[in-house]
A protein has these predicted regions:
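Low-complexity, glycine/proline-biased repetitive segments and flexible coils/loops
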Residues: 1-136
Length: 136
């Protein structure tokens, strides 16, 4: 069964693995559309035949998902050292296995896709608000 990945403000979800001949479509990342864009599209899932039936990677802040691979996040040094935020989640695998791992805590990462045996995707990671000010 094909399923389109969900749309997201900061990155589109990956498409579900295909059945039997085509994969599910990836979700749109910049929804609603704004400029500069707030995210990138998720990748389509791979078909069952002749492929491995993998879920598509979710889009991140820096790039779209591609195949099962997640989109990159965006690096920022507001805390004094570079930290990458808002990476997309990886696509799920075919076969046995558990639910997908959750996204990175305090970095707004996407949750990873689950296996076909237990298709539950992981929750997205919590975000963080950082406020800077100049003390005089």
């Amino acid at each position: 069964q094909n399923a389109k990945g969900g749309n997201g403000g900061s990155g589109g979800g990956g498409g579900r693995n295909g059945h039997p001949n085509n994969g599910g479509q990836g979700g749109s990342g910049n929804t609603p559309p704004v400029s500069p864009p707030q995210g990138n599209n998720g990748a389509a899932g791979a078909p069952n035949h002749p492929g491995p039936a993998l879920g598509g990677g979710g889009g991140g802040a820096g790039s779209a998902g591609s195949g099962q691979t997640n989109g990159s996040g965006s690096a920022n040094s507001i805390t004094g050292s570079p930290v990458t935020y808002a990476e997309g989640g990886e696509g799920g695998n075919k076969g046995p296995g558990g639910a997908g791992p959750a996204g990175a805590t305090n970095k707004g990462g996407g949750g990873n896709g689950g296996s076909t045996a237990n298709g539950a995707g992981g929750n997205g990671g919590s975000g963080v608000v950082i406020i800077t000010y100049r003390f005089q």
